[in-house]
Design a protein with these regions (language model features):
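Hydrophobic alpha-helical transmembrane segments of membrane proteins
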Residues: 1-56, 66-205, 210
Length: 210
């Protein structure tokens, strides 16, 4: 049901953006909205993505060190099938808007970039979820981050956040290596933060494996 719904939205957005913003390409508008897609994805993960404590329970009786098990599950979260969920929206949109300028190569590069953004979002979600398992007060972290992004977007002129996302998305389409390396660097940083939280914080470790 959700797949068909997202495919329909992806198709309709390609035509709607072309009609509403005739001076811009539809994929420019989509890229500007990627920040909102990431926020929506973050919120949906709390409802759809299982907590690590649930994922780890089936393996607790196996002769595997818990630390290594947690490390493995963290790495697997980067290639989780959930990170491809939004492809149902992006693929039909890209086929109708990107292919005529950049061909299938542009679409493949774009999809790789979107996947990296979703993997990055997954590790950001895990940081917030891990901290929330310790103290509910940590809900202020995502609220503060998204509040800062909103202030950066709407207070100055030029909408710098959506403009940055538009340029990043176009970098993906064009196969700009710096665009990919920037997101990969962010993923590695978030992964290291996750590992540090789990291995250093004893209460967090118990909340994950109990």
């Amino acid at each position: 049901f959700w797949a068909a719904y997202l495919i329909f939205i992806g198709v309709m957005l390609s035509f709607a953006f072309e009609d509403i913003f005739p001076s811009m390409e539809p994929y420019h508008i989509m890229n500007q909205g990627l920040i909102y897609l990431l926020i929506l994805d973050f919120l949906l993960r709390f409802m759809l993505q299982p907590a690590m404590s649930q994922e780890i329970k089936p393996y607790l009786l196996m002769p595997i060190k818990k630390n290594k098990l947690v490390d493995t599950l963290l790495l697997q979260s980067g290639i989780s099938s959930y990170n491809f969920f939004w492809f149902f929206l992006i693929v039909p949109f890209a086929l109708l808007t990107i292919i005529r300028f950049y061909g299938f190569t542009g679409i493949l590069c774009y999809l790789c970039g979107i996947w990296l953004l979703m993997a990055m979002n997954s590790y950001w979600y895990l940081i917030c979820k891990t901290l929330l398992n310790e103290k509910l007060l940590y809900i202020l972290l995502p609220i503060g981050v998204y509040g800062l992004l909103a202030g950066t977007e709407f207070i100055p002129e030029g909408n710098p956040v959506s403009t940055f996302m538009m340029n990043l998305g176009e970098g993906f389409i064009e196969g700009n290596i710096l665009s990919f390396l920037g997101v990969i660097a962010a993923i590695l940083l978030l992964l290291l933060v996750n590992l540090s939280l789990i291995h250093i914080s004893e209460p967090t470790r118990h909340s994950l494996i109990s």
